[in-house]
Regions:
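A short beta-strand motif characteristic of beta-propeller blades
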Residues: 13-19, 64-75, 112-119, 164-169, ...
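Hydrophobic or amphipathic alpha-helical targeting/insertion segments
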Residues: 91-107, 111-114, 128-131, 138
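Hydrophobic beta-strand positions that form the internal "hydrophobic ladder"
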Residues: 36, 92, 138, 187, ...
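A flexible loop/linker signature enriched in serine peptidases of the S9 family
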Residues: 40-50, 73-79, 94-102, 118-125, ...
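Beta-strand-rich domains and repeat architectures in extracellular enzymes and scaffolds
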Residues: 7-54, 74-86
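Short loop/turn segments that connect beta-strands within beta-propeller blades
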Residues: 55-59, 106-109, 159-163, 209-213, ...
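Non-catalytic accessory segments flanking enzyme active sites
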Residues: 23-30, 39-40, 49, 64-65, ...
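Residue-level detector of Asp-centered blade-edge/turn motifs that repeat once per structural unit
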Residues: 31-33, 87-89, 132-134, 182-183, ...
Length: 396
């Protein structure tokens, strides 16, 4: 028998306590050979964030905690953070929240500090690091708060033996995304200045890396105060790619030596606003095919972009959101969101396109009858444009 009661007075089985006590926040997926890593923010551990590992022999749902107690993998660079760790050959390099220093944790060992203690505490902060094997160092963004006034940002090198960071690039207000070419001879990065935000206007720069590790002949490739460029990345063949909103849409480009070549122009967003470091919405398969995420008509999609045929094939998924995409040998992994299930870390077999859920962010089970599945809608707006929205139909 149906019972009618006033709006707002019915008792929902979904409570804030049940959601928080049984949930974690997943983020920052990384690949290191066949091993998959990601970060977990756990409310039951005081909100600390740690790195976990899933190996090829592990069962779905089974993970190994990498970060020991008393460490919290978070960076405060630009305050929004992101890009707090990387993994290379089984070693995890990370920023610790309490002191903002860089640490290395080798397999089976306790973390060792790499960067010096400074005054004031947390006066030097690090983010978005990449490995420079040839020079036995990390290249990362460094934010210096040791002097009064506004913080000074730079791209710097940190020796794997430890020590004071050595500045490689400076002079602008903000930096992000230092990315080394596969042969280690070129470094690309993103930079911008006040009053622009990174989704307003940025620049993509490129420099040669000399034998002594210094940079030579830095040059701006693309970008200006009205063009947002982000996510520089190198293909296996050593060609620089990036995302730009030069057309009004964040699309994928390839640097052709004189200009950026659009790979598949379309009215879709292949990136989002770069609020934090380490965002990843595309990667390369061994043959140079690009696996990418993009938002089309309000919904996130997963696709394969053939750079020779210039064709984009959508890979059907049950997800409405896909992010933190990482591509490796024969597999990809990403964070996925669904309208009816908790967010998850998902592994994709690139040969069969089979998807496996490795970790859910919540163990709470909600009766589907309480969930209003969203509908993507569009409607005309000013200037002759269409606006898009998500409509949740009443189910009671």
């Amino acid at each position: 028998m149906v019972k009618t009661i006033p709006y707002g007075s019915w008792r929902s089985p979904i409570t804030s306590d049940s959601i928080v006590s049984s949930s974690i926040r997943l983020g920052a997926v990384r690949l290191d050979g066949p091993d998959i890593y990601w970060s977990e923010l756990r409310p039951t551990e005081g909100g600390r964030q740690l790195v976990v590992r899933y190996g090829p022999e592990d069962a779905p749902g089974s993970v190994t905690d990498v970060t020991p107690a008393l460490f919290n993998v978070r960076t405060r660079v630009h305050e929004y953070g992101g890009g707090a760790y990387l993994v290379h050959k089984g070693a995890v390099y990370f920023s610790n929240f309490a002191d903002q220093r860089l640490y290395v944790q080798r397999a089976g060992e306790a973390p060792e500090v790499l960067t010096p203690e400074v005054s004031p505490a947390a006066g030097l902060r690090y983010a978005d690091a990449v490995m420079d094997e040839a020079n036995d160092r990390l290249i990362c963004v460094v934010e210096d708060h040791r002097q009064s006034g506004e913080a000074v940002n730079a791209i710097a090198a940190v020796s794997l033996k430890g020590g004071v960071p050595k500045v490689l690039v400076s002079g602008n207000d903000f930096y992000s995304s230092p990315r080394l070419s596969p042969d280690g001879t070129e470094l690309a990065w993103i930079t911008w200045n006040h009053p622009q935000m990174p989704w307003d206007g940025t620049e993509l720069w490129l420099a040669k890396v000399l034998e002594d590790g210094s940079l030579s002949r830095p040059q701006k490739l693309v970008g200006n105060v009205k063009e947002s460029v982000c996510q520089p990345r190198w293909s296996p063949a050593g060609t620089l790619h990036f995302i730009s909103d030069a057309t009004g849409w964040w699309n994928l480009y390839r640097w052709e030596g004189e200009r950026g070549e659009p790979l598949f122009p379309m009215e879709s967003e292949f990136s989002g606003p770069q609020w934090n470091f380490g965002q990843s919405s595309y990667g390369f398969e061994d043959d140079g095919t690009i696996l990418c995420t993009y938002t089309y008509e309000g919904t996130a999609r997963l696709g394969r972009l053939d750079t020779l045929a210039r064709s984009l094939d959508e890979i059907p998924t049950p997800y409405c959101g896909v992010g933190s995409l990482q591509v490796g040998k024969g597999l990809a992994t990403f964070l996925a969101a669904s309208t009816t299930a908790p967010s998850a870390v998902v592994r994709l077999n690139l040969s069969t396109l089979q998807m496996t859920t490795l970790r859910l962010s919540s163990t709470v089970t909600i009766d589907p009858g309480y969930i209003s599945e969203p509908e993507v809608i569009s409607f005309p707006t000013t200037g002759g444009f269409n606006a898009y929205g998500i409509y949740y139909r009443s189910i009671f």
